[in-house]
C-alpha cells in the first residue's frame, strides 16, 4: 500500500534542500576566500618587513587577495576580501571602482590595508561603505616608503600594500575605490 504522506514529505525535503543550498555554497565560497586571504597575508608579511611590522601593531587587517581590473577608455575593478582582527576573520567585504581616461588592458592584483586604530576600523562600517580617499588617512606603500617605515614612524590611520600584480595595464591605484561589507 502506498503511503499518502510520501509525496508531501518528499516535496518538503526538496524545498528544504533548495532553501539551504545557497547558504552552503556561500559558506564554501567564504571559506575559500578566507583561505586565499590568509595565504596572501602570510606571503606579504614574510616577504615585506614593513608589512610584517605593521601587522603586529594593526587593530585589524583587510586583505583582498585577488582584484581584477580591466579597461579600454573606461575601466573598472572588483574583488572580495576578508577583515581579520588578530587571527580571526570578522567580516567579508568587496571593493569596486571605476575609472576613465587613457587606459587599456587587464590585470589582477591584491592589496592589504593595515588599519592601525579604531577610527580606521570604524570607518569600514560607517554609512553605505568606505570610500578610499575619504575619511581616515591612507598611505599606499611603495618600496621606498616601506624601507623607511618603522613602528615608531607609522602615524597614519591606514597603510595599504599592493601585491601580486599580473597582466598588462598601466597604473594601479586605490583612490575612489568603495569598500562595502558583504551581508552575512
Please report, for each region that a protein language model flagged, where it lies by residue.
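Generic cytosolic/nucleocytoplasmic N-terminal low-complexity/intrinsically disordered segments
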Residues: 1-2, 42
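Sec/Tat signal peptide C-region and signal peptidase I cleavage site
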Residues: 21-27
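Structured alpha-helical
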Residues: 3-5, 20
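Intrinsically disordered, low-complexity regions enriched in serine, threonine, proline
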Residues: 5-6, 27
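N-terminal export leaders
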Residues: 6-15
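Small-residue-enriched, tightly packed secondary-structure blocks
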Residues: 27-184
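Hydrophobic alpha-helical transmembrane segments of integral membrane proteins
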Residues: 18-19, 61
Amino acid at each position: 500500500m502506498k503511503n499518502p504522506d510520501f509525496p508531501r514529505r518528499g516535496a518538503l525535503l526538496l524545498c528544504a534542500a533548495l532553501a539551504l543550498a545557497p547558504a552552503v555554497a556561500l559558506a564554501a565560497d567564504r571559506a575559500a576566500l578566507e583561505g586565499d586571504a590568509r595565504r596572501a597575508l602570510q606571503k606579504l608579511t614574510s616577504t615585506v618587513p614593513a608589512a610584517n611590522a605593521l601587522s603586529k601593531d594593526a587593530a585589524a587587517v583587510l586583505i583582498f587577495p585577488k582584484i581584477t581590473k580591466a579597461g579600454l577608455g573606461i575601466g573598472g575593478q572588483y574583488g572580495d576580501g576578508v577583515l581579520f582582527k588578530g587571527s580571526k576573520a570578522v567580516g567579508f567585504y568587496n571593493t569596486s571602482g571605476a575609472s576613465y581616461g587613457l587606459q587599456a588592458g587587464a590585470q589582477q592584483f591584491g592589496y592589504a590595508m593595515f588599519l592601525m586604530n579604531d577610527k580606521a576600523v570604524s570607518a569600514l562600517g560607517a554609512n553605505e561603505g568606505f570610500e578610499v580617499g575619504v575619511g581616515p588617512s591612507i598611505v599606499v606603500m611603495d618600496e621606498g616608503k616601506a624601507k623607511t617605515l618603522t613602528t615608531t614612524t607609522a602615524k597614519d590611520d591606514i597603510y595599504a600594500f599592493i601585491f601580486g600584480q599580473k597582466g598588462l595595464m598601466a597604473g594601479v591605484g586605490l583612490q575612489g575605490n568603495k569598500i562595502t561589507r558583504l551581508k552575512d
